[in-house]
């Protein structure tokens, strides 16, 4: 079970965007990376293609961040938190390690 999933609110704990929060828009498990909305923005220079009707220029988009550089945000403590996984009944659930509160309630 993945500890960070699409839709989770995370906080960046290392790198140039340290301290910024955002929602995970995509998880790339084979590379252990996540894409967070409006965090780690990079500029891409694109060439226009008149056959497809696209214009060239400089576009800004989110670049992936390694999953070890983000931590899930706990709204109750308003800090970054660690995630645990435990069995409840017949399914696994994620919980915050600091206060044992369920994430997937």
From Swiss-Prot:
The keyword rRNA-binding applies. Transmembrane segments: none annotated. The keyword rRNA-binding applies. It comes from the Bacteria. SMART domains: KOW (SM00739). Part of the 50S ribosomal subunit. Belongs to the universal ribosomal protein uL24 family. HAMAP family: Ribosomal_uL24_B. This is Large ribosomal subunit protein uL24. The lineage of its organism: Bacteria, Pseudomonadati, Pseudomonadota, Gammaproteobacteria, Chromatiales. The gene is rplX.
């Amino acid at each position: 079970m993945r500890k960070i999933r699409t839709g989770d609110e995370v906080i960046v704990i290392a790198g140039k965007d340290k301290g910024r929060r955002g929602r995970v828009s995509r998880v790339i498990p084979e590379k252990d990376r996540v894409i967070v909305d409006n965090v780690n923005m990079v500029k891409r220079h694109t060439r226009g293609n008149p056959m497809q009707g696209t214009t060239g220029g400089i576009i800004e988009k989110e670049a992936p961040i390694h999953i070890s550089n983000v931590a899930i945000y706990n709204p109750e403590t308003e800090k970054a938190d660690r995630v645990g996984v435990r069995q409840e009944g017949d399914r696994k659930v994620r919980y915050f390690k600091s206060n044992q509160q369920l994430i997937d309630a």
